[in-house]
Amino acid sequence: MIKIVFICIILLYISFLCKHQIKEFFDPDSTNDSTNNSTNILGTKLEICSTDPMTGFHRKGYCKTGPEDKGTHTVCATVTDEFLEFTKSMGNDLSTPRDNFPGLKDGDKWCLCELRWQQGVHNGYITDVDLKATNSKTRPSIRYEIEALNLQEFLQEELNILKNKIF
């Protein structure tokens, strides 16, 4: 019985995530539509990532992008000290204050370059991602990676709840 409930929870969560992405899966060019720039990867209105520190390629708090944003800064993530050290070692120092930039510290939310976020994950530096503030313009392959990590976290939480109810 518990297995059936657990499987149903998984299927509901997957269908929720996939509901908004079927079009992009079959038509990847649909993500180039300028109207998608204001939606998140869940298909709803893009929420603000951070105003303290002020983030976003255009420094308006949102992970919006455009042709001038060569790094595609669309992933809203909470950075860790470990991730900041990693990105510094890769040539992108986000922790040192500079002109009009306070420098990031552990726990700050920031619009990350999608490929740098992916490099961090592949090197073991996983950061929490705010799905509601991560832009739908994020590449589908990276979006699926983000969702897989969030699904894993969600399932672990559900499993812990079920364990507590049983024992």
Task: Identify the meaning behind each predicted range.
Residues 136-167:
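Glycine- and charge-enriched low-complexity intrinsically disordered segments
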Residues 26-29, 33-82:
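Extended boundary segments
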Residues 93-100:
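Short alpha-helix capping/helix-loop boundary micro-motifs
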Residues 1-22:
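Single-pass alpha-helical membrane anchors
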Residues 77-93:
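Short, basic/aromatic beta-hairpin or loop at an interaction surface
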